[in-house]
């Protein structure tokens, strides 16, 4: 269709991201361009967004993650797919509850005073508030999400899926209730998942003790970082092949302070080389000890309460806080002569991500998923080339295998109110357990389990629960599952990716996604992880405010390769803004020269100049490179090809050369150049659109175009008619000649405005004819007073000389410079660089310097040596040309 000329406006003279991006997102939403259509004539392509937590605003990592997904889905939509990018958010159990409780505390109340129902109302209010924040940030980033299908992990549909999965796994014996060692937060009094435990290196102590052997003068030496747990010791373990302790296996130790008799057991878990080779076993307070205790049927003695205070099993220490108990017990053991050494030691200690409290390995009755059968099924699927998930980069598949091969049962219950309440009820009299999707009919005789499920339980179902499962007749489930790619960070392979895979295998009998594209972490410019404590975090909205979403997105998309971390540099974002500004100015010039030009006017069948043929051929190559690399998720490479084509070729060379036709008198040439400009700019904006959606839509709307939005325009395809290796070769030679002349002029400080004689000696007549045909460009960009092109040119005396493929270029210097003065200046410069070369080489030949100086200092001196040698060589060449 013809472009509406009445609505057409030229681009403003200055690129202002705020003005460009303002209102554009609403235009896309109004056009419903992001909504999946279910068109049976199109192949479906789907992605589910990793649901951000409704705990606060999105950080830079979210911006990176979602920019990748948006780039992929925009490209696929343009390639003709029926694209579903499904948005949603995660209720984030403990994280959100902690935030809501903190807000309640500020208002002078707490969840217990409110009660469960009122507290959940407050939590839902929080969710609505922060969901609105998140949506506004998605809008600022320009994300093409299908909001008609937005999901939340506590939606009724997803809650139904959670209950269905829980009940089915329970009925298969894969969910059970039992005692196990869990990560316990004494501050919030809840179990934590492994990902909610942050390990920090602290300066602690290693306490060495001697336990007496019953009926003997012998003792056995053990060591611990948590002496308060000795009150719950029920054995000492040694390796069965450790000759030092063979005679003690089966004997009894008297536990100091407590006086309890505990056995010395033999277990392969013990490392003979570590410490004394004997370890205290506390099955209720250590996961490894728990396993050893199971193997040897040891008693489990819990010595702490849920709040971290010591309980009745701690004897005289009952009521003390665990750390106060540690101090007191150390004092008592020293007095008894049991503790003989305290060693300062740096070690890793787990802290709650939410409360900061030191996490306690704690014996608790919880709900668990039995993992071995589920892991085996998932691993069997991964071993099948046709059924497996493709990890990108593939090295992360090994990480996945390592985790699944060594997996432990999954503790899924949490002592919280915000979340999916466990669908289990206990009979008030018989204590019978009932598990079902619906409450028992005689509900008055039952009490529902107070706990909720681990957040990861519901997010593990995300790829299929969001599409209507357990309704297997759901149209979306049939069409869009399994999804095509999951984009997420490599740091949650264990906690999310693996769980989605085994739950999908269990309930859908297939993988949840074809590929999983794993990116790294965003770090600051010095490579440090961004954190509140370091104060080095960057709010993506601040970056957008300063440079616009397009600049931030392009930096994020091109700044790293799959699986690698990304360092954030404000300077690099500024450089992408410069790129956007370059695109804007080039487009503005082009559009200004297309007044009255319509989509139907584009005609590429006329006589094409060398720059026309070259830019069309290079466009072909760029389309191929950008498409191929993007399909492999190599967005950095795709962006590099696009950047080089736009900046170095289209802007710096083609547009400048196009001015000869645009400002000329030949109307046919003018129309052809306009057509090439319009076509190349249109195709380039389409390729750039997934990376920089706002600016490309703005420019595309001003170009002669067809269709309502670049978002739903067709992705560029290679046109074999424009393949032209000869034109590319000819243009490369022409550009090389122009560059060499400009460089030579700069070396003798001769501005382009001053005309100079120029001689080009070619190696054959064919090349002479080629250059003669392009004489206009040589004269326009080299500004010669006289231009001779021939195979028989003699090299003049005292001339600047440069060589390109098939030709030599001479610029006679007679009349341009004072030779004697220039020779003297160059000799002084040569002496200067020679002196610098000698100085740096003397330094590098000093073995004392090379061996003792930091590597970075030595490398800097080597860099200087190379730089000085290059400058010395150039000055020598120029002197030889003048003498």
From Swiss-Prot:
One of its GO terms (biological process) is valyl-tRNA aminoacylation. GO terms for cellular component: cytosol. Its EC number is 6.1.1.9. GO terms for molecular function: aminoacyl-tRNA deacylase activity; ATP binding; valine-tRNA ligase activity. It comes from the Bacteria. It is found in: Cytoplasm. PROSITE patterns: AA_TRNA_LIGASE_I. It catalyses: tRNA(Val) + L-valine + ATP = L-valyl-tRNA(Val) + AMP + diphosphate. A motif ('KMSKS' region) lies at residues 529-533. Its main location: cytoplasm. Residues 813-848 form a coiled coil. A motif ('HIGH' region) lies at residues 52-62. InterPro entries: aa-tRNA-synth_I_CS, aa-tRNA-synth_Ia, Anticodon_Ia_Val, M/V/L/I-tRNA-synth_anticd-bd, Rossmann-like_a/b/a_fold, tRNA-bd_arm, tRNAsynth_Ia_anticodon-bd, Val-tRNA_synth_C_sf. Keywords: Aminoacyl-tRNA synthetase, ATP-binding, Coiled coil, Cytoplasm, Ligase, Nucleotide-binding, Protein biosynthesis. ATP binds at residue 532. ValRS has two distinct active sites: one for aminoacylation and one for editing. The misactivated threonine is translocated from the active site to the editing site. The C-terminal coiled-coil domain is crucial for aminoacylation activity. Belongs to the class-I aminoacyl-tRNA synthetase family. ValS type 1 subfamily. Catalyzes the attachment of valine to tRNA(Val). As ValRS can inadvertently accommodate and process structurally similar amino acids such as threonine, to avoid such errors, it has a 'posttransfer' editing activity that hydrolyzes mischarged Thr-tRNA(Val) in a tRNA-dependent manner. PANTHER family: VALINE--TRNA LIGASE, CHLOROPLASTIC_MITOCHONDRIAL 2 (PTHR11946:SF93), VALYL-TRNA SYNTHETASES (PTHR11946). Monomer. This is Valine--tRNA ligase. It comes from Oceanobacillus iheyensis (strain DSM 14371 / CIP 107618 / JCM 11309 / KCTC 3954 / HTE831). The lineage of its organism: Bacteria, Bacillati, Bacillota, Bacilli, Bacillales.
